[in-house]
From Swiss-Prot:
Keywords, ordered alphabetically: Ribonucleoprotein, Ribosomal protein
Record's compositionally biased regions (Basic and acidic residues): 232-262
Gene3D superfamilies: Glucose-6-phosphate isomerase like protein, domain 1, Helix hairpin bin
Pfam families: Ribosomal_S2
Lineage: Bacteria, Bacillati, Bacillota, Clostridia, Halanaerobiales
Protein name (database record): Small ribosomal subunit protein uS2
One term of GO molecular function: structural constituent of ribosome
UniProt similarity note: Belongs to the universal ribosomal protein uS2 family.
Disulfide bonds: none
Native species: Halothermothrix orenii (strain H 168 / OCM 544 / DSM 9562)
């Protein structure tokens, strides 16, 4: 069964591409037709490719892998935060800071600084410092929280990056490709599909379209995590089965020895 129905995609406006003069010829295979100067995306391909992306993300999540959600333009910011938090994954929904992946060591230092500032406030240190210094420290903390708050628990580089608009997030795409991190992305008619590993042809401007697709990626993470949990829960049982089989084998061997002696 498909992850989404054609009706859901139509209702969310996933089929609306960009104006025909603003297209990337490489997207030709994913375009159904043209209507009033706007390209209409082939939703049959969207259904099939979203299924493929869903399966991939679910499988990665089932192995305990990290999927980084990225969407910094206005239409995606709230959705990215909501869906990433819902499935317990890191996210970037404000400005992408250059080097977030390629210079991750420095980013980790900035996250450490954010944690230090928050601890200072919790410990009441802000109350004894000069007022001007506290204002500057709070300003620094707020800025770090805004840009790095979504990745503060990301201890290592992500295993997959999910992006809502590869043109807007061109730096994130370039960094992920440089580090050979697979990219799952919504790809509109003005994008280059060759840069993406798992493409989802669709409207990257409509809030409802971004929300629908992003929610399915989050669902895939949750389904994968549930599978991982079930596997871990099954492990003790497997050990019990192995123990039982060994004991059964031992009893059989003892019986055989007794029969031979008789």
């Amino acid at each position: 069964m498909a992850v989404v129905t054609m009706k859901q995609l139509l209702e969310s406006g996933v089929h609306f591409g960009h104006q025909t003069r603003r297209w990337n010829p490489k997207m030709k295979d994913y375009i159904f037709t043209e209507r009033n100067g706007i390209y209409i995306i082939d939703l049959q391909k969207t259904v099939a490719l979203l299924d493929k992306a869903y399966d991939y993300v679910r499988d990665m999540a089932s192995k305990g892998k990290t999927i980084l959600f990225v969407g910094t333009k206005k239409q995606a910011q709230e959705t990215i935060k909501t869906e990433a938090e819902r499935c317990g994954m890191p996210y970037v929904n404000q400005r992408w800071l250059g080097g977030m992946l390629t210079n991750f060591r420095t980013i980790k230092k900035r996250v450490k600084r954010l944690n230090e500032l928050e601890k200072m406030e919790e410990d009441g240190l802000f109350e004894v410092l000069p007022k001007k210094e506290v204002i500057l420290l709070k300003k620094e903390r707020d800025k770090l929280e805004r840009f790095l708050g979504g990745i503060r628990d990301m201890k290592n580089l992500p295993d997959v990056v999910y992006i809502t608009d590869p043109r807007k997030e061109s730096i994130a795409v370039a960094e992920a490709r440089k580090l050979n991190i697979p990219i799952v992305s919504i790809v509109d008619t003005n994008c280059d599909p060759d840069l993406i590993d798992y493409i989802i042809p669709g409207n990257d401007d409509a809030i409802r379209a971004v929300k629908l697709i992003s929610s399915k990626i989050a669902d895939a993470v949750l389904a994968g995590k549930q599978g991982e949990q079930l596997t871990e829960e099954a492990k003790p049982e497997d050990k019990e089965d192995e123990k039982g089989q060994a004991e059964e084998k031992e009893v059989k061997e003892e019986n055989n020895s007794a029969n031979k002696e008789e």
